[in-house]
Amino acid sequence: MTKDLLLELGLEELPAYVVTPSEKQLGQKMVKFLEDHRLSFETVQIFSTPRRLAVRVKGLADQQTDLTEDFKGPSKKIALDAEGNFSKAAQGFVRGKGLSVDDIEFREVKGEEYVYVTKHETGKSAIDVLASVTEVLTELTFPVNMHWANNSFEYIRPVHTLVVLLDDQALELDFLDIHSGRISRGHRFLGSDTEISSASSYEDDLRQQFVIADAKERQQMIVNQIHAIEEKKNISVEIDEDLLNEVLNLVEYPTAFLGSFDEKYLDVPEEVLVTSMKNHQRYFVVRDRDGKLLPNFISVRNGNAEHIENVIKGNEKVLVARLEDGEFFWQEDQKLNIADLVEKLKQVTFHEKIGSLYEHMDRVKVISQYLAEKADLSDEEKLAVLRAASIYKFDLLTGMVDEFDELQGIMGEKYALLAGEQPAVAAAIREHYMPTSADGELPETRVGAILALADKFDTLLSFFSVGLIPSGSNDPYALRRATQGIVRILEAFGWDIPLDELVTNLYGLSFASLDYANQKEVMAFISARIEKMIGSKVPKDIREAVLESDTYIVSLILEASQALVQKSKDAQYKVSVESLSRAFNLAEKVTHSVLVDSSLFENNQEKALYQAILSLELTEDMHDNLDKLFALSPIINDFFDNTMVMTDDEKMKQNRLAILNSLVAKARTVAAFNLLNTK
């Protein structure tokens, strides 16, 4: 016989960004609890609103499954003393399992007998097991926690109710300072406290109190309501997924509505209006069927349609205040002078240990010129890079960016164009922030890409130079994101500039006092970002092998990983990798540089391998390079079969190691083959 279990935790309003991850966590913790306690079930369903997290288990067994376990103990010769009695070791072993020596039997394992005991455990009733089910709540983790009242414990928000039902039976449990029951809270304004009659009636009981407990149902309600308004008003609404998920977790009973604002605000840049609506007010942006921005918005009320006209007016009033600010800053900022703003950046701190934003820009100017040369930009592009690098942070001192910091770079482009700057310069000011996330948009122009690289390189090197290096998940200056941007831009634009050369030369340009160890740390940090870019679907040994190669060009490292993944499916992969790996391992024994002396060759295999190495021409085509290296496998194996590398003759040994070292030097441009797993 099976039953349904309901567990609901009622809290004060959760931050929207916490709700969905916490809901998923709760479901996962419940599944683990049931599996660990041998309680079978059919399905687990999760629920969440801003004021509750809940999980329902359907088809829960009324009793644990019985458990039978075999335990292996000491060998028979240790378990029995000279008189054939059980030793203290045997007695201690069975005592630890809650059994006696009468339960011992001997079983043969690989020719020797060992003590074995079999323990049978009868399953407990589900109710007995569920006495500890609040463990799943204790084990939830949150980004931040808080104290409340005089309690010593911490949790994401104060807890008010706990409902635990097995079918219609309320289980009496405690969590923190809350005793469980069947009372849940309805909508803060439209509902009231209500009894949940049974686990199966959970959604219906709450629906009567204006709470839609199922997040997916709530989301679909919002989408359907928006589509209905679209159809009725012949408009088009941008349903941004991130915004939808946020709004979803701000309401328990959603009602979407259409609001409006004065058309005069459409003269303000669209980005300002969209940011005001979307980022600040959590409104959905409205356009006509051709994509033109309209003086309207859609918002979602946490409640029903009663007195909705008052809600609309209130939302319109709040938005207009934002738009008034935007309009004011748009007009006032145009009176400012770019040169004056750049000069004022001398007084703005980039970081107290690093200097001002002006100094940061000065370094970026030098770095960007170097990068523009390496990337073979045209003279016109180089001039644009130089100009952009000289002014690109000026918009940080405008009123608009001070109020709407999401618009940095975007407003810089607009103000630069109004001031008569070249379009390439203006675009670079916007693009230098790209990408803003791990998979965000990249710069479209070469000028913008160079400025973005220079800015990110200086940021990375500056913070490393003063010891502000990310550790664990802590990365307050977003250096991982900046570095991810560096490798993505280099790869996307096909700029095959070796990273080790870049780091060394950029340190020389702007950070001459920094030592080699510091540069090694930077390279390791960049390698970690490249590994992330390669992706976890590529086996770990292949990722490590290409990152330990002597190639520091992003595109070639990525190509090498793909080539190895492809080759790993071939029948010859194991043999080829093992022959190269053997060469790598022996080459590590080279203690000093020795040139190959062909007069010391004793057999044809030495000569054949050395000639093959001399003839080996590797290119930037990693697939072709692997083909060429793997083709050497028979020659390498023939060499090893007929040649004693580590001979007692020191000259001969060093000469043979030199042959292998010359092979490894070429092969390492693809990968460190000795790190590849062929098991």
UniProtKB/Swiss-Prot annotation:
Q: What keywords were assigned to this record?
A: Aminoacyl-tRNA synthetase, ATP-binding, Cytoplasm, Ligase, Nucleotide-binding, Protein biosynthesis
Tell me the gene name: glyS
Q: What is this protein called?
A: Glycine--tRNA ligase beta subunit
Highest rank taxon of the organism: Bacteria
For this protein, the record's SUPFAM superfamilies field holds: HD-domain/PDEase-like
Lineage of origin: Bacteria, Bacillati, Bacillota, Bacilli, Lactobacillales
What would be an example GO MF term here? Answer: ATP binding
From the Swiss-Prot or TrEMBL record, state where the protein is found: Cytoplasm
State whether keyword Hydrolase applies. no
InterPro entries assigned: DALR_anticod-bd, Gly-tRNA-synth_bsu, Gly-tRNA-synth_heterodimer
What is the main EC category here?
ligase
Q: Which residues cross the membrane?
A: none
This protein's assembly is summarised as: Tetramer of two alpha and two beta subunits.
**Is Zinc-finger among the key words of this record?**
no
Organism whose genome encodes this protein: Streptococcus agalactiae serotype V (strain ATCC BAA-611 / 2603 V/R)
Which family is annotated?
Belongs to the class-II aminoacyl-tRNA synthetase family.
What's the catalysed reaction? tRNA(Gly) + glycine + ATP = glycyl-tRNA(Gly) + AMP + diphosphate
Query: Where does the protein principally reside?
Result: cytoplasm
Give EC number(s), comma-separated: 6.1.1.14
| GO annotation, cellular component aspect | cytosol
